[in-house]
Amino acid sequence: APMLTISEEVQKRLQEKSYKIVDSVQVIGGCNVQWAHDPKTDRDIIIEINPRTSRSSALASKATGFPIALVSAMLAAGLTLADIPCGKYGTLDKYVPDADYVVIKFARWAFEKFKGVEDKLGTQMRAVGEVMSIGKTYKEAFQKAIRSLETGRYGLGHAKDFDTKSKEELLKMLITPSSERHFLMYEALRKGATVEELHDITKVKVWFLEQMKELVDEEEALIANKGALPADDALIAAKKNGFADKYLSQILEVPEQDIREKRIALGLEEAWEPVHVSGTQDKAYYYSTYNAEDKNPISEDKPKVMILGGGPNRIGQGIEFDYCCVHAALALKQLGFETIMVNCNPETVSTDYDTSDKLYFEPLTLEDVLSIYKKENPVGVIAQFGGQTPLNLAADLEKNGVKILGTAPAVIDLAEDRDLFREMMDKLEIPMPESGMAVNVDEALAIADKIGYPVMVRPSYVLGGRGMEVVYDPENLTKYMNAAVGVTPDRPILIDRFLNHALECEADAISDGTHAFVPAVMEHIELAGVHSGDSACIIPSRHISEENVKTIKEYTRKIAEEMGVKGLMNMQYAIENDKVYVLEANPRASRTVPLVSKVCGIRMVPLAIDIVTAELTGRKSPIADLKEKDIPYYGVKEAVFPFNMFQEVDPVLGPEMRSTGEVLGMSRYYGEAFFKAQEATKTELPLSGTVLISVCDKDKEEVVEVAKERNIPIRVGVNSGSLEKEILAKYDGHVTADGIVESAMDKVRIIEELNYDNIVVSIKSSDVMMCVKAHELLADKTGRLLHIHDLLHGHRKHLFGHIYAGNIQSPLSKNGRH
């Protein structure tokens, strides 16, 4: 926005038609009208109308400063547009958009989280988040959007291996729209493709392709002097066109710091322009540009604190962290600080102009954050509430003289360094699974051979289990290491012994550096190996012994105090054979902070703000006044998954997070709380149907015990071994066989012969990979995507077994059973 390639005549015509439609439908409030325009025939076709605020409403509000939802509420309450004041226009009915900047929305995808899915864009939405950027020109805004995505890219060139491909290969890859389309077009232009060729294939407007071609030509001219800093005029032009310091450093192969120092020496620094907010005065909402004079007055009335937001929503980092940032801003205001928010996500509350005293709609990169810090000179920056994004910046910010409030960046590094962390656990006499760090295949194989398979492997400094896998043998470990990207001595692969039959749990804590308070221990419902963000969890725990709960809280306090954590902290644990093991420490706000705050009735973020600002306010730590309390109800968190958008993907869960949201069910009865959570996910709950249970030999009797305990007659397809016959004989009258199968192929035959309308495949096995392979075979042969749920292990079956294997037509009673 604004429209750059649509004539004013067409824009006016579509606007007038939209007004007629809205008047005819008699919409009061926000409305979204979508059009298609054929530039060849000049024909307009209406696609759809949404008589409500929509996803684009939030984007439009942030792009224009026009508070659509607020105005919609006023109109719904009976006001008219002529009643609502609107700044220089007088009243809202006279408002005309007149922005003198360019706004770009760029979607964030997560295809890497869904193995086997084709990166293909179409009529069904597949983005999991988005960023918005603002610039004085299209080029400036577009390049700013790329570095806002936080995909490790700071410009359009040299993405993946695209620069090694020929022009013909790139043009072929462009035939199918994908999330990489812009990066492919950039490299195709570099390899000699013409604007006309790209237009013929992609149908992208020629003007946009010409803008991209100019960026390619400018980059090639810069690369001609690789190894040296660019000439003054070339650097000035590059910055005006949106080239980031980091990207210039990469393509020129010179240190980013040298680029920055030369730029500052030239007086080439970001200026700040306001986004005018309709109907309000003095709302401080700014964007950066190298193409205008600075119009950002600085106040000195109050001490300032800068909060770094979470960037774009994606799997592993979502609105849970925005919750923390918003509550941090509100708490800081109450303490008398001027709050400065930095974020680039239009979907969030943190980027509302009235959440903080001053909003910078900017990428969360070192260059952009340092520019804001230099401009505002705050007393400190808070990096612990925005997830992994600001944490990854914290160390570099500190090196550049930025005061980080709360937990020190060195503590963050300590938590990620498995060797140092293990030394600390040994000192505290806290058990931890055997582990190690590797930067190559040989090191990884040696570590795995020492600690034994299966092992859990993951990159360091990631969120959401990105790249995390359970590996069962040397062959697959070798494949994993060979495929790993960005592995360095500073960013090694972490390898831990996988606790195969463990019950996983976690605890959030508030710490002042010397004392810590743990409000709750959360019990994970899924088995070990499922990422904590994907697992349902319950507060308070149902099956962790009181002794182990005390142990977990004590371990958490000892670790927080030893590390000197100031603020929030999350600890992950596993319990195997009644022994508590530490899995990892996260000295920051976690995605469970909103959950614990709501279920336990504790204001975790404001309490953390009291602690991290104590050196500035002189206020005493609140930890001593916090007391544990009994919770007379249950809260169950359940994850929400996007498998409806990725129907070719097997929905089996694992150590890499794939959920995009979560819900909370609460009740005095734990079974009812769980059921509420399932309903809240909007996943269709089958009221009848057949359950096909596939388990390994050692678990078969246990599965039947679950069914028998619930008094549920079950029909099974069993193997023809002696164990199956013994089970059938032992539970005669309770278990009936629909067929005796010799192989996985025969299981498919049973499904086909019985013509099940609703199949739930319940798998519980210590060999997760075997289960996955069997399920894939069933799905392939039946042509259906089957839903997988883990049958709950051991003592946990009493809590939720009935949801998966029971007659869910029966109303839940007070004890949470049928």
At which residue positions do the language-model features occur?
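Active-site beta-loop-alpha junctions enriched in small/polar residues
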Residues: E347, A410, F498, C696, ...
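Hydrophobic faces of well-ordered beta-strands that scaffold small-molecule active sites
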Residues: V33, I404, V455-V457, I493, ...
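Non-cysteine beta-strand/loop elements that form the S-adenosyl-L-methionine
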Residues: V518-M522, L527-V530, I712-G721, A744, ...
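ATP-dependent carboxylate activation and anion-phosphoryl transfer catalytic cores
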Residues: A1-I223, A228-A234, N241-G242, L266, ...
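Catalytic alpha/beta core domains of metabolic enzymes, predominantly
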Residues: L728-H818
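Conserved N-proximal alpha/beta basic substrate-recognition cap immediately N-terminal to
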Residues: D357, E367-P431
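A conserved helix-loop-beta module that forms one wall/lid of the active-site cleft
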Residues: T407-M468
